Amino acid sequence: MAAALAVRRAGSAPAFGPEALTPDWENREVSTGTTIMAVQFNGGVVLGADSRTTTGSYIANRVTDKLTPIHDHIFCCRSGSAADTQAVADAVTYQLGFHSIELNEPPLVHTAASLFKEMCYRYREDLMAGIIIAGWDPQEGGQVYSVPMGGMMVRQSFAIGGSGSSYIYGYVDATYREGMTKDECLQFTANALALAMERDGSSGGVIRLAAIQESGVERQVLLGDQIPKFTIATLPPP
């Protein structure tokens, strides 16, 4: 029973009484404490994310889709507060749709990233949202932009984010190389996400992947037995 009760910090709540017996997830917001990733290759981008959504220590959803379409060839990966990131993504999708209608042409990936940056910076005191924007457009081809909490925007060859990213910085820095093919980027992303899911308690579930090129979007889901295995505990018996 003790394991199911919230651990109360000094001064934050009574140590005894009914309030002390409240599970921590009843007082926490739903969070996509997560691992997200995007990689640029010649001709497009690959995005990936785990699927676990938590409320404190409680797993609220095991199969969340954190790869959100913003336009036909533009997606974002969401980390942080589920409510905040959904609201920001919906607002940007709405604005980008109008922008595309006014110009009578597909929007640029940089435009979508700039909209995310403006909103995340303007409401930086109220939002808990870390976003990776990736997609393809006729002017620049495949592009990856990172908008971490606070509203900064930077273009990168690859980007990782979420609570699980701290476990895989060494792996992605050592493994990434320029000129990777789409299939190599898909495997690279799947391996990185699997490693993060092994170590991060807020990441888990299935792995969702998306490859965006001029021809369109290809999506796939890696279920439990398809997720790459690395640690001894998860390797099959000899």
From Swiss-Prot:
<keyword id="KW-0007">Acetylation</keyword>
<keyword id="KW-0647">Proteasome</keyword>
<comment type="subunit">
    <text>The 26S proteasome consists of a 20S proteasome core and two 19S regulatory subunits. The 20S proteasome core is a barrel-shaped complex made of 28 subunits that are arranged in four stacked rings. The two outer rings are each formed by seven alpha subunits, and the two inner rings are formed by seven beta subunits. The proteolytic activity is exerted by three beta-subunits PSMB5, PSMB6 and PSMB7.</text>
</comment>
<keyword id="KW-0865">Zymogen</keyword>
<keyword id="KW-0963">Cytoplasm</keyword>
<feature type="modified residue" description="N-acetylalanine">
    <location>
        <position position="2"/>
    </location>
</feature>
<feature type="propeptide" description="Removed in mature form">
    <location>
        <begin position="2"/>
        <end position="33"/>
    </location>
</feature>
<comment type="similarity">
    <text>Belongs to the peptidase T1B family.</text>
</comment>
<protein>
    <recommendedName>
        <fullName>Proteasome subunit beta type-6</fullName>
        <ecNumber>3.4.25.1</ecNumber>
    </recommendedName>
</protein>
<dbReference type="GO" id="GO:0005839">
    <property type="term" value="C:proteasome core complex"/>
</dbReference>
<dbReference type="InterPro" id="IPR023333">
    <property type="entry name" value="Proteasome_suB-type"/>
</dbReference>
<dbReference type="GO" id="GO:0005739">
    <property type="term" value="C:mitochondrion"/>
</dbReference>
<keyword id="KW-0645">Protease</keyword>
<keyword id="KW-0539">Nucleus</keyword>
<dbReference type="InterPro" id="IPR029055">
    <property type="entry name" value="Ntn_hydrolases_N"/>
</dbReference>
<keyword id="KW-0597">Phosphoprotein</keyword>
<dbReference type="InterPro" id="IPR000243">
    <property type="entry name" value="Pept_T1A_subB"/>
</dbReference>
<dbReference type="InterPro" id="IPR001353">
    <property type="entry name" value="Proteasome_sua/b"/>
</dbReference>
<keyword id="KW-0378">Hydrolase</keyword>
<feature type="active site" description="Nucleophile">
    <location>
        <position position="34"/>
    </location>
</feature>
<feature type="modified residue" description="Phosphothreonine">
    <location>
        <position position="68"/>
    </location>
</feature>
<keyword id="KW-0888">Threonine protease</keyword>
<dbReference type="GO" id="GO:0051603">
    <property type="term" value="P:proteolysis involved in protein catabolic process"/>
</dbReference>
<dbReference type="GO" id="GO:0005829">
    <property type="term" value="C:cytosol"/>
</dbReference>
<dbReference type="GO" id="GO:0019774">
    <property type="term" value="C:proteasome core complex, beta-subunit complex"/>
</dbReference>
<dbReference type="GO" id="GO:0004298">
    <property type="term" value="F:threonine-type endopeptidase activity"/>
</dbReference>
<dbReference type="Pfam" id="PF00227">
    <property type="entry name" value="Proteasome"/>
</dbReference>
<dbReference type="InterPro" id="IPR016050">
    <property type="entry name" value="Proteasome_bsu_CS"/>
</dbReference>
<comment type="function">
    <text>Component of the 20S core proteasome complex involved in the proteolytic degradation of most intracellular proteins. This complex plays numerous essential roles within the cell by associating with different regulatory particles. Associated with two 19S regulatory particles, forms the 26S proteasome and thus participates in the ATP-dependent degradation of ubiquitinated proteins.</text>
</comment>
<dbReference type="GO" id="GO:0005654">
    <property type="term" value="C:nucleoplasm"/>
</dbReference>
